[in-house]
Amino acid sequence: MRALLASQGICNFHNILSVELVRQAVPVFGYMYFPPTSEKVYGVGNDAILGNHHGHAHLHHHFHRGGNNNPTPIEISVGATSTRIEYSGTPVAVNDSAELVSQALGKLAVINKERYENITYNRYEFADAHQIVGQKINAPPLNYGSNVTQSLPNISSHEKRDDHEGNSTRRLVYSISPELAQAARILAESQPPTPSTGEEADLAMNVRMKYFAESNDTNTPQQAHRHSDGLSEYAVTWADEMPLANRTTVENDGKLLKRASSSDYWMANLEQRGASPYAPTGYKVFRNVKDYGAKGDGVTDDTAAINTAIADGNRCGADCSSSTVYPAVVFFPRGSYLVSSPIIQYYNTQFLGDPGDYPTILAAASFVGLGVITSDVYVGDQDEWYINTNNFLRSVRNFKMDITRTDPNAYVCAIHWQVAQGTSLENIDFYMSRAAGNTQQGIYMENGSGGFMANLTFVGGNFGAYLGNQQFTTSQLVFVQCKTAMQVHWDWAWTMQDVVIESCGTGILLTGGAGGSFSTGQGVGSLILVDAIIANTPTGIMTSLYGQNSTEFLLQNVGFFNVQKAIIAERFSDPILAGGNEVLIDAWGFGLYGNASGVFFAQENDLPVMKRPEALVGSNKYVKPNLFTRRRPQYYDLGGSQVIDVKAYGAKGDGVTDDTDALNSVLSTAANLSSIVFIPYGVYIIKDTLKVPEGSRIMGQAWSQIMATGAKFEDIEKPHVAVKIGDHGDEGIVEIQELLFTVSGPTAGAILVEWNIHESTQGSAGLWDSHFRVGGAKGSMLQAKDCPKRASTLNKNCIAASMLMHITQGASAYIWRDSWYREPTDIVGQRNFTGYYLYSKSRNNALLNRLSNTCQTAMTRLINCPDETYAFLGRGWPQSYTNKTIASMVCSRGCKDSIQSWYEEVTTHCKEFDTKEDVMNFRGGILWAGWNQTCLQSPQGGEYCSDVIAGFSPVKHAEEMLDSELCSYCYTTVLQMAQQSPYSFYDQSYQRLLNLTQERCGLTGATDIAKPVEDRSDDPNDFCASDIVYTTIQGDTCDSIAVTHTISSAALFIGSPEIIDCTDIRPGLSICLPFSCDNVYTYPANATCATIEDSFGMDSGVIRRLNPWIDGGCTNLQEWSVNYGHVLCVSPQAGTHTHMAPPPGVTSLPGSDTGFTDQDIAPPANSTVANGTTMSCGRWHVARDQDTCTAICVQGGIEFSLFLAVNPSLSADSCTTELQMGAAYCTGPTQGWGLVRPNSTTPRSSVVATNTALDLGI
């Protein structure tokens, strides 16, 4: 015998059979973690454990790839040799280990299945820490006794969901005991996996090559110093700064140090200087799993080594809900890492695989647990290590996840992902069994509140991805030969862009929600599928629809190729979108929508197609060009570039030292040298602006913090930029990733990032995986203890920032890959704003070029006000915001000073350049007049006059106003101020009102209209699209003008702000008429959309399309006629449009059904027509069990509002519950179903559409 010692607690069971552990093991869900400490190890030779090796074939049985047979359960067996191990002093035979694992897998096949079927939805509250200490750490060990395994399937899912107090919910929660973890490990090493055939990798590679265009990893700017090596001289730096040279001869200075990392990746070989200033001394941010004993040889079980690498340093695990103190990057060099129980990713952790050669995480056939990688640990049915909606800051990227060898019946998933904002999965291949009946899944996600996934490829499996989260974004997902590519079982909103589904059974499965004892019935809120292709797949998309919980589903730029059924609804045999060899969709969707009349269901329809500007599309194309995307640069092959570690050149990142100058020096030099700036983890204090020049490429580590603090960021009235990206007018390259921009308060004046640069090539100026956080973290001085949520008074030191990010005019920023902007939800105190410009070089270059420099400076000055003030340029009655917060921001002293200064300076410095066409201060004058009128306050109580006036009693004419309101300070003063300003809205209409106030209120003063200031340089008011300007005369109304000129009275009113009352139009107004219709119709007081459409022989919905102000249920037709008049267009404005035929090769483009039929038919035999249902019906539906109104509408192709109209026994709120089984409901009324038919002896008047107005008097 020989003794072996593994310093990190990692034992190789090829050589070790007897282990006496003298340290305490912590059982957690899915893996056994052994804290590193001393141990005694005793070993014997290989022959004992490897004797009678025929058991190998059973352990590594290969499933029938692509075959039709059910997967064979894994048989774990060993030979007759009764080798034994010592486990915690208890002898355990290898045969016993096989038996333990076999029983456990049988139990897991049941309990994991129940976990999938009993979804745990989000919790939105934090637990009381005092109540969970000691309980949260440990779940009960998996009970894998044979009696339990056999009895559990007899408990139905329904019983488990209803049993809130019993033990059934606890049966879904388990931990892997030390005994079971050890047994799984012994078997994994005693019979190592056979080498991969490479089939899955080939499939993944071939499909990606088939559909994706190649792209460069990075854009390399040219070096400013052009020498043979680019580094032969000192770089130009700021005065008094340390010169940066290529110091390759100095030891331990940040150069590339070749270590035994088995990786060529520069980060793995760089001296690791990353440190958390708030963690204990010696805490490691970067940890290479091989430094902790992992082998990566595909033979040694690396589970314990990996988990030790993750947990090292007393990190935020079982007894910690969250932490910003202990970040970690866990690096995996190339290799194959065999694991037999789950790898637990701690809070604030990155798993980073070698980007040049992705490592493989290989799950053993003896794997026990649910997820090979898991982001949260269940310790109760609703209790986990971390609150799932608060599970921030984690990523996994650059891996191959191989679970093909795991038990096909145990519902194992490669990644169990329960996460929130600031999280990502990137560059991962998932390999699963392709045998029929297997239960393996790539990703299992049941809850969370946000995140991002990109560049993922799924091969095989029961589900490629099983998804549920609040709001999520994915890009470049590929599914190959999965039974179901992905299922989305709940969300609030999900955007899937760039999806490829090839040779699967079903493409996408959308469900209305799963059960569970704590379920809220949450279903899929909405899903948008953009730039996708589904090919060689029998069923493209399957969805279940529920009247109370209907999926809202939109497709844009999607192609179905060789798909039998493109989209089908559950329980219906006919697809709602037929398949074919080639079905191309520009824009299509269905779902619930709401308006003032209620909530309605819109069945499948073509939708207006968004025109994609060239700047937004890339080279990839499935149907039409896809939206442009760019993956984050990996810098895995630097070529001639140099990595500059900022800590090697003076930056401290210690959360105390001012690093502004050191960082600016490095950034300036690196940009000159075209080098990569590496910012190891740390908290880098900046007390002035950090300047990122054009040509910068910056990479952080575990979200290195750039923390603004100090006097320059404290003044709320003088915002100061913390990080400035380029200068105004710059064009070129900037690449930034893995930074966290933050503050240490008080920083009321901080603008965290100002982005000025514009891309030189598509996507060359970008920001990836970088976050903005103000408050709520160690060192911010803005935590709960500093800024209590319900403080009685405002603490000005708790105003965290002026702005998180400002993208200046003329800049372009490619912000992608999970950038998170986190700030307090409450806006308190005064604020400064991004503002806007009234004139700029890009828009007004010709005008500005003829002005003096002083005048140009004055005219291009920023208006530092909220966007609401921009509306003042429209000149109108003062806006009532009915919101004190908005009003106080608009009427702040800072906004007033900004507008007043602009107006006065332009008036002073630019008057000499005024011409008949161009009055330089025109726009500023309008703004200034608008501000003064809007921000006028009542002397009684200080309420804004616009709000006071908004509360006056409604009247039709000013003469009907109460004297107390007409003669009030606010009303009379607003009119007087308007009369005094040549820039205001004051005209003949308001002159009449001012005269009225003087007559009734005993006031005196001028009422004449001042000569208006004109500016025709850029004023659209003199533009008339129809080229028809009409001058009103006495007696005109909207209806009379509309009938005379064959236009819509509503279009006239909406497009003519001069018209205040459609029934009382002041004469002498010059009005630009809208485009005319060929035919108009004046409708009477009893008309409905249906009666009008019937009279003209129109399909249902045509009147609403021609007059889009009418709502979906036509309920506002009569109500809004008071304002809009009574004249409708019954033909298109500006002529009739003829639709183009579909492009060649397109089959079954979806259309929209009007819901009407051509002729009446009798109700089905032996059925009773529902009470009140119309008999003018050509299509019927007999209600049956499990029907919903939404499903009936989809099947019948009828809009929900029309369905309710023809079946009045049903209501919008309770439609489904009011359905009577066996009753017949009309789902296809005939045209004119609502009309009272005349006697047969009286011929019905024919309606003839002419080129004149029609008044049929229905």
Curated annotation (Swiss-Prot):
UniProt-listed InterPro entries: LysM1-like, LysM_dom, LysM_dom_sf, Pectin_lyas_fold, Pectin_lyase_fold/virulence, RHGA/B-epi-like_pectate_lyase
Observed effect of gene inactivation: Leads to enhanced fungal virulence, with faster decaying on infected fruits.
Boundaries of every LysM domain copy: 1028-1073, 1179-1227
UniProt entry tagged with the keyword ATP-binding: no
UniProt-listed Gene3D superfamilies: LysM domain, Single-stranded right-handed beta-helix, Pectin lyase-like
Keywords tagged on the record: Chitin-binding, Lyase, Repeat, Virulence
Region: Disordered, residue numbers: 148-168
Bias (Basic and acidic residues) ranges: 157-168
Pfam families: LysM, Pect-lyase_RHGA_epim
A Gene Ontology molecular function term of the record: lyase activity
PANTHER family listed in its UniProt record: AM15, LYSM DOMAIN-CONTAINING PROTEIN
General remark: In plants, chitin acts as a microbe-associated molecular pattern (MAMP) that is recognized by lysin motif (LysM)-containing plant cell surface-localized pattern recognition receptors (PRRs) that activate a plethora of downstream immune responses.
Primary role: Non-secreted LysM effector that might be involved in manipulation of host defenses for successful infection.
Domain comment (free text): The LysM (lysin motif) domains are small globular domains involved in binding chitin in eukaryotes. LysM1 contains one LysM domain.
Family: Belongs to the secreted LysM effector family.
Name of the protein in question: Non-secreted LysM effector LysM19
Gene name of this polypeptide: LysM19
